[in-house]
């Protein structure tokens, strides 16, 4: 036994970082604390002689040595850095120490504090009886490698192999997902350093891919406020040391180290703070909601766009795109989505039904937002009460069926989010502006543009509330009257009736490709206003040529 036993012991490395309310006189913006400890109630002091933290050279006395627990360093800084951490053992033989490379990353402004935990599993092959006893007292576990008779010191590979699968990255809780890199570190210190390197490399690529996929999942989950579920999943995985992957989604923004990013992401989700021997550690773990800044930014974008339109059941993609370029012109958006539109055009027939449904739901969203917001164009509502009343009924009717359809379609849309939302995004704006875009789509495209100054001439004429509703979609009519008034001071009844009819047909329009063409036409005039869910324009603000083009588009649909 003495000659052929393997002992595995776990360590937890982690750090906590948060923004200071006010920077220090030296310009330090963050307070951080980094620590090394044992899992849960394990006292690593039994086998750890000291822990050496190598801070950045910019710190005074960058070599910090802790000979007694808690093994931690607290400092203030303005940037993250890679910190080598050496754990020295109370061992009279090799290995005498193990060195970890720790990524001390900080949270960006506006993001939650960092609460990061990294679990490492150290595997000691054939330790001396004395050192083995110390390891066991610190929570170490005896592991008998298969084929113990043949596996003794000459073959370090056996112990290492088990460590790799066991290693889990970024355990926010106290999971002991050894990084594999650490296992490799220990083993390398013992016998084979090359193994350690290879393990780390393997683990990192896995982490990268996992973090990417997980980041996407996280974004969706956050939009749905499913942090709790993700947390539960993470907990379930903890024992397996595999739970890090789901939380990995949060990339550590400040740092490039994928491992810690994953850890961080897990820590945010692994909400349960591991009971750390040092109290500060425990508290640090709770805040572990520090999502990597990037994911959080993406999530914020998506969530904001979704927030405005999630109720109508609009595809998340649409919303994300809308929030994407908050201040880019719709034209840019159209160009970016042009590619998607092309792809869509081919399968468009097959997915036509879906698109129509989505456009309906989007339209409804636009109605809601517009009726609530009554954009400036709405305020410029037409001066004819009769036309106003006409507008209202048409919009109200469209709203009723839209909502019912949206409710029916929401479930379908969620299932078809990827394909349909992709289509919507593509259709939203085609570089040539030929892409089909439902009003809501164009709205989402321009929702980013909502910051764009409304180019519609503020109508001096009465702003009837009904018109604000009409704007629900583009409120083409309400907006249209004011400009014509501005231009001519008066307008003939025949033309007004024509515009009223045009408005009615626009509001009843459901063909996505035609909607896109109309949006493109209006964009060229510059007389439109964009909100989170609507694309508003004033028919009276358009010149007669543009109105004729709109009518021709509708005629094409009718035929």
From Swiss-Prot:
Pro residues: compositionally biased ranges: 270-281, 455-467
Gene Ontology molecular function: chromatin binding; lysine-acetylated histone binding
Subcellular location: Nucleus
Activation/inhibition comment: Acylated lysine-binding is specifically inhibited by the tripeptide XL-13m, carrying a 2-furancarbonyl side chain, preventing recruitment to chromatin.
Pfam families: AHD (PF17793), YEATS (PF03366)
Annotated site residues (Acylated histone binding) in this chain: 103
Compositional bias of kind Low complexity: 305-324, 369-396, 437-454
Chief localization: nucleus
Location of region: Disordered: 147-484
Acidic residues bias (residue ranges): 409-421
GO biological process, alphabetically ordered: positive regulation of DNA-templated transcription
Biased composition (Basic and acidic residues): 180-190, 200-263, 325-355, 474-484
Keywords: Acetylation, Activator, Chromosomal rearrangement, Isopeptide bond, Nucleus, Phosphoprotein, Proto-oncogene, Transcription, Transcription regulation, Ubl conjugation
Chain residue ranges for the region called Acylated histone binding: 56-58, 78-80
Crosslink feature (Glycyl lysine isopeptide (Lys-Gly) (interchain with G-Cter in SUMO2)) location: 240, 262, 342
Keyword Secreted: no
Annotated ranges, domain YEATS: 1-138
Modified residues (N-acetylmethionine): 1
Keyword match Cell cycle: no
Cellular-component GO terms for this entry: cytosol; fibrillar center; nucleoplasm; transcription elongation factor complex
Functional summary from the UniProt entry: Chromatin reader component of the super elongation complex (SEC), a complex required to increase the catalytic rate of RNA polymerase II transcription by suppressing transient pausing by the polymerase at multiple sites along the DNA. Specifically recognizes and binds acetylated and crotonylated histones, with a preference for histones that are crotonylated. Has a slightly higher affinity for binding histone H3 crotonylated at 'Lys-27' (H3K27cr) than 'Lys-20' (H3K9cr20). Acts as a key chromatin reader in acute myeloid leukemia by recognizing and binding to acetylated histones via its YEATS domain, thereby regulating oncogenic gene transcription.
Record comment regarding domains: The YEATS domain specifically recognizes and binds acylated histones, with a preference for histones that are crotonylated.
PANTHER family in the record: AHD DOMAIN-CONTAINING PROTEIN, PROTEIN ENL
Disease: A chromosomal aberration involving MLLT1 is associated with acute leukemias. Translocation t(11;19)(q23;p13.3) with KMT2A/MLL1. The result is a rogue activator protein.
Record note on quaternary structure: Component of the super elongation complex (SEC), at least composed of EAF1, EAF2, CDK9, MLLT3/AF9, AFF (AFF1 or AFF4), the P-TEFb complex and ELL (ELL, ELL2 or ELL3). Interacts with ALKBH4. Component of a SWI/SNF-like EBAFb complex, at least composed of SMARCA4/BRG1/BAF190A, SMARCB1/BAF47/SNF5, ACTL6A/BAF53A, SMARCE1/BAF57, SMARCD1/BAF60A, SMARCD2/BAF60B, SMARCC1/BAF155, SMARCC2/BAF170, ARID1B/BAF250B, MLLT1/ENL and actin.
Protein name: Protein ENL
Originating species: Homo sapiens
Lineage, uppermost ranks: Eukaryota, Metazoa, Chordata, Craniata, Vertebrata
Gene that specifies this protein: MLLT1
């Amino acid at each position: 036994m003495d000659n052929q036993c393997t002992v595995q012991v776990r360590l937890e490395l982690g750090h906590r970082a948060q923004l200071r309310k006010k920077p220090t006189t030296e310009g330090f913006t963050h307070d951080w604390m980094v620590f090394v400890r044992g899992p849960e109630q394990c006292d690593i002091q039994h086998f750890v002689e000291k822990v050496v933290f190598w801070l950045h050279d910019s710190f005074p006395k960058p070599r910090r040595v802790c000979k007694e627990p808690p093994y931690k360093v607290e400092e203030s800084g303005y940037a993250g850095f890679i910190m080598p951490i050496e754990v020295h053992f109370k061992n009279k033989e090799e290995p005498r120490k193990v060195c970890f490379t720790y990524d001390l990353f900080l949270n960006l402004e506006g993001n939650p504090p960092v609460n990061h935990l990294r679990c490492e599993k150290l595997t000691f092959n054939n330790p001396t009886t004395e050192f083995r006893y110390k390891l066991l007292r610190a929570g170490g576990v005896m592991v008998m490698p298969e084929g113990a008779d043949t596996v003794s010191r000459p073959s370090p590979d056996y112990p290492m192999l088990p460590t790799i699968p066991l290693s889990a990255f970024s355990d926010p809780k106290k999971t002991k997902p050894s990084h594999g890199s650490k296992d490799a570190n220990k083993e390398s210190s013992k016998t084979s350093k090359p193994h350690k390197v290879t393990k780390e490399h393997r683990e990192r690529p896995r982490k990268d891919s996992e973090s990417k996929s997980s980041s996407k999942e996280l974004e969706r989950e956050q939009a749905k406020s499913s942090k709790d579920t993700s947390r539960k999943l993470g907990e379930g995985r903890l024992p397996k040391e595999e739970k890090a992957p789901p939380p990995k989604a949060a990339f550590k923004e400040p740092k490039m180290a994928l491992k810690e990013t994953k850890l961080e992401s897990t820590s945010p989700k692994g909400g349960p703070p591991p009971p750390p021997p040092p109290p500060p550690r425990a508290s640090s773990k709770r805040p572990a909601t520090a999502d990597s800044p990037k994911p959080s930014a993406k999530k914020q974008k998506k969530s904001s766009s979704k927030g405005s339109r999630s109720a109508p059941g609009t595809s998340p993609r649409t919303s994300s795109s809308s929030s994407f370029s908050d201040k880019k012109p719709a034209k840019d958006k159209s160009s970016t989505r042009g590619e998607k539109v092309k792809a869509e055009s081919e399968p468009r027939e097959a997915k036509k039904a879906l698109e129509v449904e989505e456009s309906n739901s989007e339209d409804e969203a636009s109605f809601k937002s517009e009726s609530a917001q009554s954009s400036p164009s709405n305020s410029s509502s037409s001066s004819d009460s009769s036309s106003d009343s006409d507008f209202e009924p048409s919009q109200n009717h469209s709203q009723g069926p839209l909502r019912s359809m949206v409710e029916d379609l929401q479930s379908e849309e969620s299932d078809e989010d990827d394909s349909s939302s992709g289509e919507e995004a593509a259709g939203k704006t085609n570089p040539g502006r030929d892409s089909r875009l439902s009003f809501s789509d164009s709205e989402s495209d321009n929702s980013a543009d909502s910051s764009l100054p409304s180019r519609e001439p503020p109508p001096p004429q009465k702003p009837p509330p009904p018109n604000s509703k009409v704007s629900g979609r583009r409120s083409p009519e309400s907006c249209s009257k004011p400009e014509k008034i501005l231009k001519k001071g008066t307008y003939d009844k025949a033309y007004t009736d024509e515009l009223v009819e045009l408005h009615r047909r626009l509001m009843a329009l459901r063909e996505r490709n035609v909607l896109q063409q109309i949006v493109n036409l209006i964009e060229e005039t510059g007389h439109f206003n964009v909100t989170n869910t609507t694309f508003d324009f004033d028919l009276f603000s358009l010149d007669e040529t543009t109105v004729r083009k709109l009518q021709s588009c509708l005629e094409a649909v009718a035929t």
